[in-house]
Amino acid sequence: MTVKPEQAQPKPNAKSDILFIACGALAKETKAIIDRYGWSVELKALPAVYHMTPLKITTNLDVMLEKLKGQYERIIVVYGECGAAGIDAVLDRHEVVRVKGPHCYEMYAGADQFGRLMNDEPGTFFLTDWLLRAYEKAVLRGLGLDKHPELAPLYFSHYRRLVYLSQAPTEILIKKAQTI
């Protein structure tokens, strides 16, 4: 489901005038919402691993939006701010909107619940289904902890609590979350 920005060209007879561009970490849930409500919406997703280098989010969104210019009546971006400085400026330049929220954790928990979680413990590390499934690649290898486990305290010492925001929990994901 994820595409490279240069592959973003829609089919010549696109079935929808509306496109959602989602983060790969939100694509499965975005597709489920589209299907649940029977929306006539096309969905494209950028790789979730771009979060490891957030500049890739803004750069690749910009490239994708430029390639798709004039192809859709409306484009909605399903991304938070995600540490990607300038994402809103890119979207403004292309006259595109995004869903509200600083990151997917707030989208999954809801603004009120997320606010309570952060007020209760600002040092909270959040896990999602995607992050659990990709933990080894995105966190351990992505942060170099597979080769330098001694760096873990530098990355995680300020976290005091872990919250798993499950979208479609399985016994395997729950057990994995409990081991982290």
Where are these regions (language model features)?
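N-terminal basic/disordered segments at the start of proteins
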Residues: 2-37
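Gly/Ser/Thr-rich loops at beta-strand to alpha-helix junctions
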Residues: 21-28, 50-51, 76-88, 102-105, ...
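Short, aromatic/basic amphipathic alpha-helical patches
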Residues: 30-36, 87-92, 174-180
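Structural motif
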Residues: 19, 74-76, 161
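Long, charge-dense
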Residues: 86-137
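A conserved mid-domain beta-alpha-beta active-site/ligand-binding segment of alpha/beta enzyme cores
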Residues: 119-178
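A short beta-strand-loop structural module common to alpha/beta enzyme folds
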Residues: 40-57
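Short, well-structured alpha-helical segments in soluble
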Residues: 59-71
